[in-house]
């Protein structure tokens, strides 16, 4: 009986989570995703089609 309880406690220990590590990893991922998003927005490389519209207007003149 004691052996069965020891086996069950060892199996349950495999599935315990270290919530502090998970939280830190999530915060680091969120910070990196935020910085990458800001770099994309403020890079000036992607202008949502503004350049194409300006070229079309200049070609007509």
Curated annotation (Swiss-Prot):
The UniProt record lists the keyword tRNA-binding: no
Subcellular localization(s) per the UniProt record: Membrane
Annotated organism of origin: Xenopus laevis (African clawed frog)
Cellular component per GO, a single term: membrane
Keyword Ion transport: yes
Transmembrane segments: 24-44
Annotated family: Belongs to the FXYD family.
Record note on quaternary structure: Regulatory subunit of the sodium/potassium-transporting ATPase which is composed of a catalytic alpha subunit, an auxiliary non-catalytic beta subunit and an additional regulatory subunit.
GO biological process, one term: regulation of monoatomic ion transport
Protein name: Sodium/potassium-transporting ATPase subunit gamma
Signal peptide: none
InterPro entries per UniProt: ATNG, FXYD_motif, Ion-transport_regulator_FXYD
Membrane topology: Single-pass type III membrane protein
Source organism phylogeny: Eukaryota, Metazoa, Chordata, Craniata, Vertebrata
Function: May be involved in forming the receptor site for cardiac glycoside binding or may modulate the transport function of the sodium ATPase.
Keyword entries, A-Z: Ion transport, Membrane, Potassium, Potassium transport, Sodium, Sodium transport, Sodium/potassium transport, Transmembrane, Transmembrane helix, Transport
Primary localization class, coarse: membrane
Entry GO MF terms: sodium channel regulator activity
Name of encoding gene: fxyd2
């Amino acid at each position: 009986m004691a052996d069965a309880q020891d086996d069950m406690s060892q199996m349950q220990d495999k599935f315990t989570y270290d919530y502090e590590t998970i939280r830190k990893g999530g915060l680091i991922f969120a910070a990196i995703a935020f910085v990458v998003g800001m770099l994309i927005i403020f890079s000036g490389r992607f202008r949502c089609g503004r350049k194409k519209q300006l070229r079309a207007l200049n070609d007509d003149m």
